[in-house]
Design a protein with these regions (language model features):
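Short glycine-rich, Thr/Ser-proximal phosphate-binding strand/loop in the N-terminal lobe
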Residues: 2-49, 80-82
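Short glycine-aspartate micro-motif
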Residues: 5-11, 66-68, 132-137
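Conserved A3 ("GATE") glycine/threonine-rich loop of ANL adenylate-forming enzymes
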Residues: 15-16, 113-115, 140-142
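Short beta-strand scaffold segments in enzyme catalytic cores
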Residues: 17-21, 73, 142-143
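Glycine-rich phosphate-binding loop and adjoining helix at the ATP-binding site
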Residues: 32, 41-52, 56, 65-67, ...
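Conserved Radical SAM active-site core
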Residues: 59
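Phosphate- and other anionic-substrate recognition elements at nucleic-acid/protein interfaces
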Residues: 62
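A gly/ser-rich beta-alpha-beta helix-loop segment of oxidoreductase catalytic cores
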Residues: 125, 138-140
Length: 143
C-alpha cells in the first residue's frame, strides 16, 4: 500500500542542492532543509545521486509523495535545454524521467526562477496582484 506524505521540494543550485518537505497549504517548509554540496562535475547522474540522498533523508515525512525539483536551466516538459551552473551534459536530458527512475517517485522538474515566480504568486507578495509581476533571483547565478 502506498504511504502518503508531505511533498518534497528540491533545488539544484550551482553550489548546493537543498531539499525539504513542503506544506503546500501555507507555502512553507514543513521541516528544516538539508543542503548537500553540488557535486563537481554536476552531471545528471551525480546530481540524481544527491537527490536520492535527500529523498532518503526525508523518507519518513514524505512517504511516496511527489517531488518537485528546480534546476538553473531552461526546462520544457521536464527536459533540460540549457545548463547554467550545472554540467553541459544536462542539455537535452529528460530530467523528470531520470529522477523518477532514481527515486521511484513522481517527479516534476522546472526552472528555478519559474518556480520562485509561481510560489510568489500563490503564497507571497504577488498573491492577488493584478498585472505584471517581476521576480529577480540572486544566487550562484542571476535569474
Amino acid at each position: 500500500m502506498a504511504k502518503k506524505g508531505t511533498p518534497l521540494g528540491i533545488d539544484v543550485g550551482g553550489s548546493g542542492i537543498k531539499g525539504a518537505p513542503v506544506n503546500l497549504k501555507r507555502g512553507e517548509l514543513a521541516s528544516p532543509r538539508l543542503k548537500i554540496l553540488t557535486p563537481s562535475p554536476a552531471t545528471p547522474e551525480a546530481v540524481a545521486d544527491v537527490v536520492d540522498q535527500i529523498v532518503d533523508h526525508f523518507a519518513k515525512e514524505t512517504g511516496d509523495a511527489p517531488i518537485g525539483v528546480t534546476v538553473p536551466a531552461v526546462v520544457i516538459h521536464g527536459t533540460v535545454l540549457s545548463a547554467a551552473n550545472i554540467d553541459p551534459s544536462w542539455i537535452e536530458t529528460d530530467a523528470e524521467s531520470l529522477l523518477q527512475e532514481h527515486t521511484g517517485r513522481k517527479v516534476t522538474v522546472v526552472n528555478d526562477a519559474d518556480a520562485a515566480g509561481v510560489a510568489e504568486v500563490h503564497y507571497g507578495a504577488a498573491k492577488g496582484v493584478k498585472g505584471l509581476v517581476i521576480l529577480t533571483t540572486l544566487g550562484t547565478g542571476i535569474g
